[in-house]
Amino acid sequence: MSEIKEARLQKARSLVSKGFASYAQSFKVSNTTSFLLQEFDYLENGQEADFSVSVAGRVLAKRVMGKIAFFTISDQEGQIQLYLDKRIINLNLEKQKLLSFEDIKEIVDIGDWIGVYGTIKKTNKGELSIKVEKWEMLSKSLQPLPDKWHGLTDIEKRYRQRYLDLIVNPHSKNVFKTRAKCISFIRKWLDNRNFLEIETPILQSEAGGAEARPFITHHNTLDIPLYLRIATELHLKRMVVGGFEKVYEMGRIFRNEGISTRHNPEFTSVEIYEAYSDYFDMMNLTEELIKDVVADSCGSLIINYQNKEIDFSKPWLRISMKDIVKKYTGIDFDSFSGDFLAAKQAVKNINVDLSNKVNTMGRLLNEVFEQKVESKLIEPTFVIDYPVEISPLARPHFDNKEIVQRFELFIVGRELANAFSELIDPVDQRERMQLQQSLRDEGDLEAHCIDEDFLNALEIGMPPTGGLGIGIDRLIMLITNSASIRDVIPFPLLKPEITSKKSEKLPLNEVK
C-alpha cells in the first residue's frame, strides 16, 4: 500500500476513534453552488448575508493560515470557497459533537467529500464564500487526485478512469451536461410534433436494419442464439404497419466493428419514422431538427469545430452521389454506359483501393465516394440517390431502378444521418433480402438475413413512409467541439489494459 493511501486510511481511522463517521449515511443539501453564486452576487466586498445554507461537495483546494482556513469545494453545478474561522468552528464544541478546527485542519484532504453548514459572505477580495459554522465528513478519499495544474494528461486514462477526468477537467463535465441536454431537447422536439417514443428489443432473433456485424449471445433457458440489435429500424416499421404513424426511438445500438475516433461498438442513435412521407420530407425534418438543436445548445447557427467554421444557417446542399463524385474526382459514371471494367480502371487511376467485394457499378461508385469525396464535405451536405446494391431497405428511385430514394447527411467529413423513402413493396423487399442472404452465405457477415416476420408485416400492408437515423454521438461531437467519439461517450470501449499491478486489499471492518 502506498504511503499516501496508508496516511489517509489512518486519518479515516482517527475519525472513527473520535466518534465520527468517515463514510456518512446522508446529508441534507439546501442549495447548489451555482444558485448561491448567482443569488448573492450582489453582496459588496466584506458584506455578509443572514442566510443559512448547507452545501456538500468534493474538496479541491485547501489553505490553512493560522486561525483561519480556506477550502474550495465542487458540486455538480460548480465551485465555491469555504471560509473557516477557528473561533466560530470551535464555538459550539461543548454543546454538540462536532469536528474541531484542529480536526478539520489535520484530517481533511483534497479529494474528500464534505458537507458544511453556514452563512454567505463575500470576502474583502470579492470572492463569494460560505462562512462555515459546522463541518461533516461525508466520504474520506484514500487516493490523491491528479495534479490540478497539469490535470489528467494521459488521454487513455481519461477514458479508462472517467471519474478522475470529470473531477479535474471541467470541460469534460460540461460535455456530458450538454449531451444530456441535447438528448432531452431532441425528445421534446419530437414529442411536440406528435411522434411517439417506442422501445424495441435489444436482444433479437435476427439482427437486421443495417449492414453490420452483430454481437452474438445465448439464451440459456430457450437454448437459442440471440443478437444485440444493430438498428431499431425493422421493429419501428412494424409499429407503423400496426397503425402508429409517427414513431421514434432514442437508444443504444451495438455493432461488432472496429474502434476509432469516429466509431465505438456501442453508440446512441435516434431513428424516426413518419407515415405518408418520403426522403424529401426527411431531409426537411433533419435540417430543421439539427438546426434547432445546434441553436439551443450553442446559441448560434455558426459554430467552430476543430478550427473549421460550420454555418448551419445557409441552405444545405443537396446533390446526388454521382454528381458529387464527378465534382471532386472528374469521373462521370454515366459516361461508362454500364461498362464495369472501364469504370474500374478509371477508379484505379485515381488510386482508389478496391476489395473483391466491390463487384458492381454501384459498389464501385460508393467506394470512390467514401475514399475520395466524403472527407471533403465540411459544410452540411445531403448526398442523395444511392446505389440500390448498398441500400436493400430503400424505395427504388422514380425513374432509375439502379438507385434508390436515400440520402446521407455529411458534416465535417463525417456521416451524421441516413434516411430513405422506405421500401414498402413486400415482393421487392423479399427479392432484395434473398440477395442479401446469398451474400451472407458466401461469407459477407455484414449482409442482411431474411426476416420472415418483417416480410409478413409488409404483406399485411405498410403505408408510404419516410425513415431517418441520426448518430447522436457524432452530433454531440460537433456541438461540443470534441475531436473523438470517446470524448462524448462516458465509458467508451477500450483495449484491455496491460498491467502487472496487483490489487491492493484494505483491512476489513476497520473504517466505517
UniProtKB/Swiss-Prot annotation:
Q: Which reaction does it catalyse?
A: tRNA(Lys) + L-lysine + ATP = L-lysyl-tRNA(Lys) + AMP + diphosphate
Q: Which residues bind Mg(2+) 1?
A: E408, E415
The record's GO molecular-function terms, alphabetically, read: ATP binding; lysine-tRNA ligase activity; magnesium ion binding; tRNA binding
> Which family is annotated?
Belongs to the class-II aminoacyl-tRNA synthetase family.
Q: Which UniProt keywords apply?
A: Aminoacyl-tRNA synthetase, ATP-binding, Cytoplasm, Ligase, Magnesium, Metal-binding, Nucleotide-binding, Protein biosynthesis
Quaternary state and partners of this protein?
Homodimer.
The record, for CDD domains, names: LysRS_core, LysRS_N
Q: What is this protein called?
A: Lysine--tRNA ligase
Give the Enzyme Commission number.
6.1.1.6
Instruction: Give me the residues that bind Mg(2+) 2, please.
Output: E415
